[in-house]
Amino acid sequence: MTGRVRTEATTGLSAFPLTPLRDDRVDEHAYVELVERLARSGVDSIGALGSTGSYAYLDRAERRRVAELTVRHAADVPVIVGISALRTSHVRALAHDAQAAGASAVMLAPMSYQPLTADDVVCLYTDVATELSVPMVVYDNPGTTRFDFTPALYARLAELPSVASIKIPPPPPEAEAAREHIARLRAAVPARVGLGVSGDPSAAAALLGGCDCWYSVLAGTLPGPALEIARAALAGDSGEACAASNRLAPLWDLFARHGSLRVVAAVAELLGLAPEDCLPRPLLGLRGRDRAEVETVLTALSLTK
């Protein structure tokens, strides 16, 4: 894989759908509907089994099946499959399954029970890279992994030919600070390695500041408004991108208060895209006043697609 460059799967808008459950089993019908909806929407890639897809709560057989369903129903849209797990041998097995399913790329976060060192993380990615014939996205998500990457660690991992993109946490919200932050990260990695942002409220600033990709929670359920932000930002239209993002401020506020997963699960349930109580236990969906507030925001913003 020497000389691999960023691919279509790791540029533009990447939509990460829920993996809805019904009676503690993956609701394949609902999941396929979500994937086909995304395939028709115009997103640049579909990210299966990300944090929004509850990968950490699914066993290997469930994850293999989800990967297969995603590729089968994504039409010609590239598919990124999450392969994160606690043990390296399990990650390698998941990488095998993802590639066998036809994934265009894989995404890996350094999951742990015992705290990991930087050397542990380099070893993980190096070991997994030997199994890959597709690009890999390094997933930096300290909110769930409790592991903090540094620019120096990005640089070490970017030496691996498999690494095509790094999914970074939200940059500072101010435009100039975001540009400076992203420029520092770009200086740490080769030009062939892209930078993608997670944290939907920061996406407009990050794309305008130099990120190549938005790895989006919102787009997995509501691709329409996410596409408005992404297309404007990637075209350099800061006014329209920021305006489109600012219109969603009530939704971003819900993300901040309840977590994006619970909010998009409620959105999907309210729109009939997922069954009630679609999250894996012990995660509880929003109820009562919190759920009613999500419905109020959906109605006020006319969010249906």
Give residue ranges: language-model regions.
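A general structural signal for well-ordered alpha-helical segments in protein cores
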Residues: Y31, R63, A67, V91, ...
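Alpha-helical structural signal in soluble globular domains
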Residues: S41, R65, L69-H73, D97, ...
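Catalytic alpha/beta core domains of metabolic enzymes, predominantly
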Residues: P142-A256
